[in-house]
Amino acid sequence: MIPEDDTTLSSLRPGDVRPELLAPAGDMDCARAAVANGADAIYFGLDRFNARLRANNFTLDSLPELMRFLHAHGVKGYVTMNTLIFTSELPDALAYLGYLNAAGADGVIVQDMGLARCLTEWSRRDPAMKLELHASTQMTLTSPEGLEFASRFLDLKQAVLARELSLKEIEQCARHTDIPLEVFVHGALCVAYSGQCLTSESLGQRSANRGECAQACRMPYA
């Protein structure tokens, strides 16, 4: 985290919002390291509906312990459900949301518009549903118009902009929406737009939008 006396923070103007530092974590060691080094929140996947199924992930059983640890240190935890959901999977996905809410997760980062709409409606009719809805970078929100369209139907508490945007494009989005925006400042870029790549599916029948990206764009070709 940037020290409080850092000139970047001291130059914030009245009314400016201090950025939230969000870090990924795949296990408790990573979570502890993120907390120890000043993260305001962490994001992580579980064993389903997660774009990084082949990475180290937490389990449903470990989630309550993780959330207790995070909240004891004033840190939030957001669960990634950043894949496309098949219609046949929707009941399981909704049950997942219920479990995440009961376990104390602060929010979910969602790609699928249908699932996002379901969570919006659930939150509106049931005050006990406390999960915040965050739009994933996989939702491909690239413009003020896209943000405006999404906000008509979804109660977004935060939107992760597509990773491919320039600083000028990010600024334009920020000027035209009241939705808090999140951007990646470190990490890999997709060869295509976030959430729109079909290369892995076309070449190896492993969909990047289902957590199975084979990273075909990084393979050597003769």
Identify the function of each model-found stretch.
Residues 2-141, 161-165, 169-222:
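Active-site pocket-lining/capping segments in soluble small-molecule metabolic enzymes
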Residues 143-146:
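Conserved nucleotide-cofactor-binding alpha/beta core module
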Residues 157:
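Long, basic N-terminal domains or extensions that often function
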